[in-house]
Amino acid sequence: MDQTTRTVQAQKHIALVAHDHCKTSLMQWVAIHKEKLQHHILYATGTTGHLVQRATGLPVTAMMSGPMGGDQQVGALISEGRIDLLIFFWDPLNAVPHDPDVKALLRLATVWNIPVATNRTTADFIIHSPLFDRQVEIEIPDYQLYLQQRLK
């Protein structure tokens, strides 16, 4: 597929997602990085968003709970170019009923070329990157060209 570029602003739109066994770890990570994260716009799946907001006081736009469609809501935001970064602490040792949604969410993050952290170490590398607080250009699929070609 042909590519185009999208400008990711210095103020990032960050999605926070965590499986049940990882919610405490994500809340701790957000608390540690609260000073840096407060300058960005946070989104999260339902339960995670409410827990993060209560634990840190940071404003979080909460979607529905993951199993109730929240993963798909975050995926839609990624597809629309409204999420710049996904922090998703997932539990690879426990299956969840909405595993297909999890796979779809990770797939969309890859398709739309946004950074994804699936554990604390990767999240630390991302938040400490010199690009984290800067405007950057990323390559994304050229959906308009794709659509034009499909409609010929």
UniProtKB/Swiss-Prot annotation:
User: Where, in this chain's numbering, is substrate bound?
Assistant: 19, 23, 45-48, 65-66, 98
Top-level taxon: Bacteria
Coiled-coil ranges per UniProt: none
The GO cellular component terms are: cytosol
Q: Which GO terms describe its biological process?
A: methylglyoxal biosynthetic process
Q: Where is the active site?
A: 71
Its keywords, alphabetically, are: Lyase
Q: Which Pfam families match?
A: MGS
Q: What is its EC number?
A: 4.2.3.3
Task: Write down the top EC class of this protein.
Answer: lyase
Q: Where is the MGS-like domain?
A: 5-152
Please give the Gene Ontology molecular function terms for this protein.
methylglyoxal synthase activity
Query: Could you tell me what reaction this enzyme catalyses?
Result: dihydroxyacetone phosphate = methylglyoxal + phosphate
Q: Which CDD domains would you find in this protein's record?
A: MGS
Q: Which family would the database say this protein is a member of?
A: Belongs to the methylglyoxal synthase family.
List the HAMAP family.
Methylglyoxal_synth
Primary role: Catalyzes the formation of methylglyoxal from dihydroxyacetone phosphate.
PANTHER family named in the record:
METHYLGLYOXAL SYNTHASE (PTHR30492:SF0)
Protein name, as recorded: Methylglyoxal synthase
